[in-house]
A protein has these predicted regions:
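Catalytic machinery of carbohydrate-active enzymes
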Residues: 1-214
Length: 214
């Protein structure tokens, strides 16, 4: 959207799959973060959008042909752009911390979470919903949790931290949009959330996360 000159962003539901629907909580959580961006003049939800200049809903027909950014660029007929697209004030309370998250989808069981937690447990701050946090602590032991109200809170926490570690979840995309240092637990079956910039590291590339954590 930034590459196309910005403007008013209209969000809608592209299908009726419950976990994919944006209306309600997901939209209300995302809206404050979007409204902070200088290239977005407004944000709204519409069930049946009209008078749209660029419609990106059809990008899924390119599934399997590249990253999500590349697929969306194909749908819009433009070259992929991975320039920093998020700008927010960092939460300075997270200085020295490493923000992590792990959603229930897009996992890689070879990723050394236990070793990472054992090494930096006192610096880890988990961001995620109750079920994700509960599952994470049952698997890897107790870590601190940072409670957030919306995506703006999450992005500010990530921006204020030393690093983000997580899988292909919405917090990853916030870290990538900020060009924040990160390590991704890349899903082998669906490695479509790759954004190449200095400081972004992907497990699928054969990296050793333990060597990257300072």
């Amino acid at each position: 959207m930034r590459k196309l000159g910005g403007g008013h962003l209209v969000i809608t539901d592209h299908n009726s799959t419950p976990q994919l629907m944006m209306e309600g909580f997901k939209y209300e959580s995302l809206k404050p973060l979007l409204e902070q961006q200088d290239y977005i003049t407004g944000v709204s939800f519409e069930k049946t959008p009209k008078n749209i200049d660029y419609n990106v809903c059809g990008f899924r027909k390119y599934w399997g042909t590249g990253t999500i950014i590349e697929m969306q660029a194909k749908e819009l007929g433009i070259e992929p752009c991975i320039d920093k697209w998020l700008q927010i004030k960092p939460d300075l309370n997270l200085q020295g911390k490493i923000v992590c998250c792990r959603s229930t989808r897009y996992r890689n069981e070879l990723f050394p979470w236990r070793e990472i937690i054992d090494k930096i447990r006192d610096r880890i701050v988990f961001i995620g919903v109750h079920d994700e946090y509960g599952e994470f602590t049952r698997a890897f032991g107790k870590v601190d949790r940072f409670l957030t109200n919306n995506c703006l809170d999450i992005a500010q926490a990530i921006a204020g931290s030393d690093m983000f570690i997580g899988n292909q979840s919405s917090p990853f995309w916030m870290a990538a949009g900020l060009h924040h240092p990160l390590i991704q637990e890349t899903c082998i079956e669906t490695p479509d959330s790759i954004v190449r910039y200095k400081g972004a590291n992907y497990f699928i590339d054969g990296i050793n996360p333990l060597e990257l954590i300072k």
